[in-house]
Amino acid sequence: MTRFFIVAFLIGILSSCENENEDNNNINADYTVFAGNYYYDPQNLTINVGQTVRWINDGGHHDVNGEINSLNNEPFDNPEVFNSDAISEVGAVIFSYTFQTPGVYHYDCSVGGHASNGMIGTVTVNTID
């Protein structure tokens, strides 16, 4: 009987974790960028002010770094600074960001040598006319 309660308890905990991941993956976004082994897809994206981009892990351990260029350790000098923690869970939302200032935003994956292997991207944010 005790085993039954332990198993039921563990199933309940695992079910609640699954629901949290589903909620995280359902973040409203205008655009989605996939982050995989040394790539962001699409690598270059053009959006309007006020639109939201979310980055989804397509495999591996990745982040979204829009603060310091991982290749030269210089600031990107983006109109707004953004960055995320690294995520390993496949299919999980790495990061979601709503761009409020027009301009060109550069970012990379600062994990290991990912940026030097081509894991870089840009988001161009246009004003709404």
Question: Which stretches of residues belong to each language-model region?
Answer:
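Winged-helix/helix-turn-helix nucleic-acid-interaction surface
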Residues: 10
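Sec-dependent signal peptide recognition
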Residues: 1-7
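Extracytoplasmic copper-binding redox domains, predominantly the cupredoxin/blue-copper superfamily
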Residues: 18-129
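C-terminal motif of bacterial Sec signal peptides marking the signal peptidase cleavage site
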Residues: 13-16
